[in-house]
Amino acid sequence: FVTSIAACLDGSVEIDGDLSLRKRDLSPLTSALRELGCGVSSDCLPYIVSGPIIPGSFWIDESFSSQTLSGIILASPGFSGEVKISLRGEAVSRWYRGLTIETSGLSGWTGGYGETMILDSWVVETPERVVIPGEVSLCPISLLFDNLHGTNSLDHCQFGESSITDAIEEAKSGGYSHVSLRDASDIIAPLAALMSMGKGGVIVGASHARGKESDRIMSTIRMLSSFGIEIEENNEGLTIPGGQSPNQPKGPIDCEDDHRLAMTAAVLATKVGGELSGHEICEVTHPG
């Protein structure tokens, strides 16, 4: 989001991030900004963004991430003229996109979502109150802990209904689960661990999880394998045999600069022990 906002400025801004962000392919966003007349020195952080955005048109493949569209919408108050966006692909992470559209609407944006969107400058009017939902994507971490220790650490009803809670409920159904993470790929690691200890199942709709802080399909396989839990890659996600239990790893667990992988490994280690390498990345989610 910062990159899109910086691109509206008449000048150059250098943007950098931690190791996990430096590993991410940001080409969907950087390519879009170049189509709008900006200079972007690289497709990965660190890079220099030289604006401003000029009126024009481009397209976004929504099957990769919701973040490119969200960033452009949030930056649009700084536009100097109309920008036309054509949307392609099967959209993922639609809940987060919807949150962007809802909060922008509360702040004065009069546009809406569609296959073709026209964005122009608008005046931000700060609302008196905006309710930000709780970070429900951390719920499976709590559920995993409870499953391992027989506790009830969190009132899961407080999160209401969402694509993430739907996926969690399917995984908890008590049978062989078929879970789509089209809109909830962030929870793939803890959910796979939970399913492996239950009846098992398949996770689908998670191809875009490969573009996170790590390739979360393969990194989840590697991490769980270290705990003696065996799962397999499929075309869209993971195939997970049930009836498994974690064992103490024989060596350090590489958290791969991925905070969600590190949190899942840490919870498993509370039951069987283990040494984590790079667990400090958890501060991305929980500073301090």
Describe the function of each predicted region.
Residues 1-288:
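Short, structured segments at the rim of ligand-binding sites
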